[in-house]
Every structure is written in C-alpha cells, then in structure tokens.
C-alpha cells in the first residue's frame, strides 16, 4: 500500500511516520512545496510542487491512501498567514480531486472539535481555522459519491513527549520547572487531552482496517475525563511550589470553554494526564 501524508513533519505526523515505515516500508510526505520520500534510510526529496502541479505529482505517485494531518493554525495578531487556507483546504481539495479522477481512493482526515464548537463570542467553528476545517467534512461527503472512501477522525487535544507546539500543559510545566511566573486565565475552560501514543494507535487501527467498518464515517477519540486548567494548576500545586498565577491573564478571544462530543469514540483512551505531568515536573 502506497501511503501519502500531509503534515507529516508536525507533532502527530512525526510520531506516526516511524510506525508506518516499520509496517509499510516507506511513506511520502507533502510539505509546503516539496514531497519527501521517507523510509528507514531517512528522508529524501521526491519532488518539488506548486498548487498547480500537485495534481500531476499525485498522478505520478499514485497513492492508495492519504492521511491528512496538515493543520495551518490561525493567528489573529499580525499579518494573516494564508497557510490557514492552503494547508487546511487547498491541499486536501487537490488530493480529493485526484482521487475523484481515479474513481477510487482512501482518505483519512484528522479533524478538530473546534469545527463544531462555539467560541465565547458564539461563533460556530470558533475561528477561521475551525471554520475552514469544517469545510473539509462537507467536501468528504461530496467526494464519497465518487468512490472516495473517507474516515474523518476528530481530535480533542493531544500531548506527550517531544511536543514543542507550545500547548497549555507544556507551557505550565516549563514555567514550573524554570520557576518562571506564568499568568493564566481564571482556568475554568475544560480540556479533554489524549496521550500521543493512543492517537497513533487509533490512526493505525483505521489504516489497517479492511472490512469497511469505518468507511465514510466521522469518528472521534477522547478520554472519559475532562480537566479544567484550574484543576491542572491545583494538581501541580500539590507536587511543587510554583509561580503560576490563575486569573492573572485573560481568556483568549476565541476561547472554547467546554468540549462538545458529537461523534462515536473509536478508541476509549485512558486519562494519563496526571501521570504525564508528574513525570515531567522536576522535584
């Protein structure tokens, strides 16, 4: 099976790629302007591409499966980053058009619960990132009528070793370990965070399924436990003295205060957050 990834150099992609290589030998990763071939021998450039030439590159690659991990995040400060459109919509659209032309293909899309959540301002989709990601769900339904088989996996949050994305849990841990002051919001927002290894296992489960049980379906992965930021801080307070300041900062303009669970949970992951935090806090 020839597998192509988008966003393979991101946090989830870099964790998934070695596991796929071990099982399938090699994968191809679509970056911002190059496609790389990745195997046990390392990574090498397969070709450069533009949005106009990507379709032809896919014809040459002839993938059986594409796993769409690309995520162009929205930043509401400074000049707009068009990758929020390019990564989240343009590349998936071109791939789906390619599969439509073949009258076959399998597409695993990694989505976000922000797509159907509401921000504190009452905006469904939260911000341009979530709104654009939600468009892909509607596209998947369209292309399924042209023999493109999709599985859409909704994530609620991820964490784990070697995560350099600056997510809230790691920001808190870094501040505690460096004895820095960190001003946080009042911390009432609820999080449902899944350990990276469980997410990878769930994706592999979908990749290796061959009985059609996940065909043309949107699924999700989450744990049975929600944690507020306030609860996380209180837990850390029991472990180590720190300079975390709850209420010293404000909620984000597009804050989501609680997860909304709309789709079947494919993988009943255990809540491992406290164990992870305990292992990372320097005593």
Swiss-Prot record:
Signal sequence region? none
Source domain of life is Bacteria
- Disulphides: none
- Name the species this protein comes from: Yersinia pseudotuberculosis
Stated family: Belongs to the NAD(P)-dependent epimerase/dehydratase family.
- The protein here is known as CDP-abequose synthase
Question: Keywords of this protein's UniProt record, alphabetized?
Answer: Lipopolysaccharide biosynthesis, NADP, Oxidoreductase
Q: Can you cite a GO biological process for this protein?
A: O antigen biosynthetic process
């Amino acid at each position: 099976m020839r597998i192509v990834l988008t966003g393979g150099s991101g946090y989830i992609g870099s964790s998934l790629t070695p596991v796929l290589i071990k099982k399938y030998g090699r994968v191809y990763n679509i970056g911002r302007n190059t496609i790389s071939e990745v195997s046990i021998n390392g990574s090498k450039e397969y070709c450069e591409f533009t949005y106009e030439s990507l379709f032809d590159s896919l014809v040459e690659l002839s993938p059986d499966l594409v796993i769409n991990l690309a995520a162009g995040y929205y930043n509401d400060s400074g000049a707009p980053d068009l990758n929020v459109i390019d990564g989240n919509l343009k590349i998936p659209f071109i791939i789906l058009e390619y599969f439509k032309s073949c009258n076959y293909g399998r597409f695993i899309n990694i989505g976000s619960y922000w797509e159907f959540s509401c921000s504190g301002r009452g905006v469904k989709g939260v911000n341009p990132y979530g709104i654009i990601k939600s468009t892909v769900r509607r596209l998947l339904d369209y292309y399924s009528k042209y023999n493109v088989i999709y599985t859409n996996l909704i994530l609620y949050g991820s964490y784990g070793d070697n995560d350099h994305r600056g997510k809230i849990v790691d920001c808190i841990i870094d501040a505690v370990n460096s004895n820095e002051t960190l001003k946080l919001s009042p911390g009432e927002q609820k999080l449902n965070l899944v350990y990276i290894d469980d997410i990878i296992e769930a994706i592999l489960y979908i990749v290796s399924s061959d009985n059609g049980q996940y065909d043309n379906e949107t699924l999700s992965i989450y744990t049975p436990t929600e944690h507020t930021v306030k609860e996380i801080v209180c837990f850390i307070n029991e472990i180590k003295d720190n300079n975390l300041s709850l209420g010293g900062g404000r909620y984000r303009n597009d804050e989501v205060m609680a997860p909304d669970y709309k789709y079947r949970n494919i993988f009943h992951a255990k809540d491992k957050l406290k164990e992870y935090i305990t292992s990372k806090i320097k005593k």
